[in-house]
Design a protein with these regions (language model features):
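Single conserved hydrophobic/aromatic residue that forms the stacking wall/gate
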Residues: 167-170, 174
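Short glycine/serine/threonine-rich phosphate/pyrophosphate-binding segments
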Residues: 14, 41-43, 68-70, 123-129
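Short Gly/Thr/Asp-enriched flexible loops that form oxyanion-binding sites at enzyme active sites
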Residues: 124-137, 141
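Short beta-strand-loop elements within alpha/beta enzyme cores
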Residues: 110-121
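A glycine-rich helix N-cap at a beta->alpha junction
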Residues: 71-95
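Anionic-ligand binding region
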Residues: 148, 154-165
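Glycine/small-residue-rich loop that forms an oxyanion/phosphate-binding "nest" at active or ligand-binding sites
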Residues: 92-107
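N-terminal beta-strand-loop-alpha-helix module at the start
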Residues: 1-63
Length: 174
């Protein structure tokens, strides 16, 4: 099974966010960046799935300037098999659709069986990228997943809802 894990580099929770001199963005030079914590959970789940089935490939995918290579290396250190860096030097905090289109373009040729993302990023918190990518690639999509169970060509996920849990099943391409 070939699993992609999308990871975003976000400002650490202890970082200050000073405004730059032109007052139109933050001064990124003083920020400590980390892997988005929800994406870290997705990476952990991908590694668990690979271990359970006994084979496969986990690929960490991130988009942004050269500094995002740090979170790709972190993913590799945790057990991912390889990383893909989608180079983007511009301010990519535009909109989820544009970001999703860039990811989809990079993911298409890889033929992943499963794509995992965190619930949302700790910086902008939009939570739309994974769902949009799923739609663009024609994948079944589930959000708020807290547990997975793979059997042959099917995946069963447990989703955490406001007051209960629900289970969903998907076939072949997850």
């Amino acid at each position: 099974m070939k699993i992609a894990v999308l990871v975003k580099q976000v400002p650490g929770s202890e970082s200050s966010l000073p405004i730059n001199e032109s007052n139109d963005w933050i001064d990124e030079s003083s920020i400590t960046y980390v892997m988005n914590p929800p994406d870290n959970f997705a990476l952990e789940e991908a590694l668990i799935i690979k271990e359970k089935i006994g084979s496969g490939e986990v690929v960490v995918v991130s988009m942004g300037p050269s500094r995002v290579q740090k979170v790709i290396r972190e993913g590799l250190a945790k057990g991912a098999d390889r990383g893909i860096h989608i180079q983007e030097d511009e301010n990519i905090e535009t909109d989820p659709l544009t970001i999703s289109e860039r990811f989809t373009e990079a993911l298409k040729s890889e033929n992943f069986d499963l794509i995992l993302t965190g619930l949302q990023s700790d910086d902008t918190g939009m939570g739309q990228t994974g769902v949009l990518i799923g739609e663009m690639l024609g994948f079944s999509t589930a959000t708020l997943v807290i547990e997975t169970d793979l059997k042959q060509d099917k995946i069963r996920v447990k989703r955490e809802l406001a007051v209960s849990y629900t289970h969903l099943r998907a076939h072949e391409t997850y």
